[in-house]
């Protein structure tokens, strides 16, 4: 079947955009250095439960946050309602998520160092065993965006963003569909 002929798929109460099945994707931190956490006009979508989890671990990650991020959190909290009416993580200077932090990172495949990579302070605390909460599920699912339509029905769309061109190329090289790349977070959420 031609991928242009595919229509929205329904899996239980989840409507799945066909390009989640047909398109390829694999994050390439060498190329983007975590740019999805520092670009955009709003923070990552969060639930009230996630906001509580984040607030409970602020003491754990506080020193990893920039002074600007700390000031934003002191002023408005860890989240706000964006122009579309969604709860999202707070951002610094209209773009950077308040939970971004930077460090050199060893590539898991060949061990080379990726310099000055943007990471999530929440996820780093989780990986260091300091927290049971990893990060908002919307971050773990990226580049898939989930939308709740009500009555338990969700829609999943593949968000194609120019900063992820290298991830698309790497996914094509590995022949790795979006849904396979995100299998863990998809299973956890749905």
Residue ranges and their predicted role:
Residues 1-190:
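Short loop/turn segments that flank or connect secondary-structure elements
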